[in-house]
UniProtKB/Swiss-Prot annotation:
Pfam families: Fer4_7. The lineage of its organism: Bacteria, Bacillati, Cyanobacteriota, Cyanophyceae, Synechococcales. It is a peripheral membrane protein. Its cofactor is [4Fe-4S] cluster. Keywords: 4Fe-4S, Electron transport, Iron, Iron-sulfur, Membrane, Metal-binding, Oxidoreductase, Photosynthesis, Photosystem I, Repeat, Thylakoid, Transport. The gene is psaC. PROSITE patterns: 4FE4S_FER_1, 4FE4S_FER_2. This is Photosystem I iron-sulfur center. It comes from Synechococcus sp. (strain RCC307). [4Fe-4S] cluster 2 binds at C21, C48, C51, C54.
Length: 81
């Protein structure tokens, strides 16, 4: 089953999500949008098992990273009924 990982611009570059991911789906890449100068990226979403440990580890008030599991992706986009 395919999962979608979305990184929002509220990411503060803390690396908590990257360290929490047991399958190294995430990595940090350079970004000028925060003090840390980096943002999480999800180049290997095909390896995501949907454990959502990255979401749990995110310290921002608005989760900067979200994992949408299979059909949940289309529901969240209003494409499923």
């Amino acid at each position: 089953m395919s999962h979608s990982v979305k990184i929002y611009d509220t990411c503060i570059g803390c690396t908590q999500c990257v360290r929490a991911c047991p399958l190294d789906v995430l990595e940090m890449v350079p970004w000028d949008g925060c003090k840390a100068g980096q943002i999480a990226s999800s180049p290997r979403t095909e390896d995501c098992v949907g454990c959502k440990r990255c979401e749990t580890a995110c310290p921002t008030d608005f989760l900067s990273i979200r994992v949408y599991l299979g059909d949940e992706t289309t529901r969240s986009m209003g494409l499923a009924y």
